[in-house]
Swiss-Prot record:
It comes from the Bacteria. One of its GO terms (biological process) is translation. The keyword Cell cycle does not apply. Gene3D superfamilies: 3.30.420.100. This is Large ribosomal subunit protein uL18. GO terms for cellular component: cytosolic large ribosomal subunit. Part of the 50S ribosomal subunit; part of the 5S rRNA/L5/L18/L25 subcomplex. Contacts the 5S and 23S rRNAs. GO terms for molecular function: 5S rRNA binding; structural constituent of ribosome. Belongs to the universal ribosomal protein uL18 family. It comes from Synechococcus elongatus (strain ATCC 33912 / PCC 7942 / FACHB-805) (Anacystis nidulans R2).
């Protein structure tokens, strides 16, 4: 039986998460991509705490976005998550693409976060 795209994403995510762990010094920038929106969190896996979060559903972005599921929305979320992480004192992170390919919306979020000052 053919493996679905969603199952391929889940397998990649499990494989990636075996090696990527967020520490207090270098937390994990986790990305979740749905059809209509994109979500990002900065997570300290050692403590099990989310340090910062942003999404295309965020009230700060919702009014200015025409759609939550395009590259412009992803770039806006990347910039917002970088600002919120830096406000908490986080400058370097480990990027967790969530099993998604580094292309399109995931790439737009990552590049916007880098431009806004996060290092990874």
């Amino acid at each position: 039986m053919k493996v679905s795209r969603r199952e391929s994403t889940r397998r990649r995510h499990r494989r990636v998460r075996r090696t990527i762990v967020g520490t207090p010094a270098r937390p994990r920038l986790s990305v979740f991509r749905s059809n209509n929106h994109i979500y990002a969190q900065v997570i300290d896996d050692a403590a099990g705490h989310t340090l910062a979060a942003a999404s295309s559903l965020d009230p700060d972005l919702r009014q200015s976005l025409t759609s939550g599921g395009n590259q412009q929305a992803s770039a806006a979320v990347g910039k917002l998550i970088a600002e919120r992480a830096q406000a908490k004192g986080v400058t370097t992170v480990v990027f967790d693409r969530g099993g998604n390919l580094y292309h399109g919306r995931v790439k737009a979020l990552a590049e916007a976060a880098r431009e806004a000052g996060l290092e990874f």
